[in-house]
């Protein structure tokens, strides 16, 4: 099965290797780039880390936190902290639903990108909430990306994995009608409901893995026996 994996360059080679170890003919392309920014760490009772990219930045800068809520097991593994909690589903909406009461009246700081979900920001309704932008996301739409879109148009891939809503938007902006039709006829995976929603706006039905991780994607693809 030829699988196209869309995720930032910093994490792409590791993911491709993992898929190939599982027997997939894996390819990859970054449709976004990450631009890291300077930031300070304010006093807080709880920290929220929403991605592996944010966790990696904190680790590289030697930031040690106390109590952390992390989105994703891989994110949690990268964090230096006394305690790390995880929502039952690895998305911002579930984090809000499950931890809002715990965070009520607390000082909460969220380390994230400029393109994060609005759900986390709703914590400002119950907590002394601050958002720290540790990196910005910009779309990549150069020659490399256009070549991949052409391969999608021509039916080269059996499956494509979108790992974020921004990545989905970046690719879709390069898609003509033939590309959109091709996406409707291959197996599309979205890691999480927000990404699936972006694809659905263009009439593309995406499957969502039970666990919003690349391990979950692998299990989903294996279950389809394509």
Curated annotation (Swiss-Prot):
**Pathway it acts in?**
Porphyrin-containing compound metabolism; protoporphyrin-IX biosynthesis; coproporphyrinogen-III from 5-aminolevulinate: step 3/4
Q: Which residues form a coiled coil?
A: none
NAD among keywords:
no
Q: Which UniProt keywords apply?
A: Lyase, Porphyrin biosynthesis
The protein's matches in InterPro entries, at most eight in alphabetical order, are given as: 4pyrrol_syn_uPrphyn_synt_sf (IPR036108), 4pyrrol_synth_uPrphyn_synth (IPR003754), UROS/Hem4 (IPR039793)
In the record, the note on similarity to other proteins reads: Belongs to the uroporphyrinogen-III synthase family.
In short, the EC number is 4.2.1.75
CDD domains reported for this sequence: HemD
Q: Which organism is it from?
A: Archaeoglobus fulgidus (strain ATCC 49558 / DSM 4304 / JCM 9628 / NBRC 100126 / VC-16)
Highest taxon in the source lineage: Archaea
Name by which UniProt lists this protein: Putative uroporphyrinogen-III synthase
Q: What does this protein do?
A: Catalyzes cyclization of the linear tetrapyrrole, hydroxymethylbilane, to the macrocyclic uroporphyrinogen III.
In its UniProt record, a GO molecular function of this protein is:
uroporphyrinogen-III synthase activity
The uppermost taxa in this organism's lineage are:
Archaea, Methanobacteriati, Methanobacteriota, Archaeoglobi, Archaeoglobales
Catalyses which reaction(s): hydroxymethylbilane = uroporphyrinogen III + H2O
One GO term of the biological process aspect: protoporphyrinogen IX biosynthetic process
């Amino acid at each position: 099965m030829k699988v196209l994996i869309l995720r930032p360059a910093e994490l792409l080679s590791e993911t491709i290797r993992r898929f190939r170890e599982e027997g997939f003919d894996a390819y990859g392309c970054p449709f976004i780039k990450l631009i890291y920014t300077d930031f300070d760490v304010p006093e807080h009772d709880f920290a929220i880390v929403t991605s592996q990219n944010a966790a990696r930045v904190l680790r590289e800068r030697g930031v040690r936190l106390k109590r952390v809520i992390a989105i994703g097991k891989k994110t949690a593994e990268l964090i230096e902290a006394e305690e790390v909690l995880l929502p039952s589903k690895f998305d911002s909406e579930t984090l809000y639903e499950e931890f809002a009461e715990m965070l009520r009246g607390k000082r909460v700081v969220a380390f994230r990108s400029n393109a994060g979900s609005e759900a986390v920001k709703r914590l400002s309704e119950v907590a002394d909430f601050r958002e720290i932008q540790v990196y910005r996301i910009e779309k990549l739409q150069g020659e490399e990306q256009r070549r991949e879109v052409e391969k999608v148009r021509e039916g080269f891939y059996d499956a494509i994995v979108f790992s974020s809503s921004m990545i989905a938007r970046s690719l879709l902006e390069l898609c003509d009608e033939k590309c959109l039709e091709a996406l409707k006829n291959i197996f599309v995976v979205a890691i999480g409901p927000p990404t699936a929603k972006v694809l659905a706006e263009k009439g593309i039905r995406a499957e969502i893995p039970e666990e919003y991780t690349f391990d979950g994607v692998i299990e989903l693809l294996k279950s389809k026996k394509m």
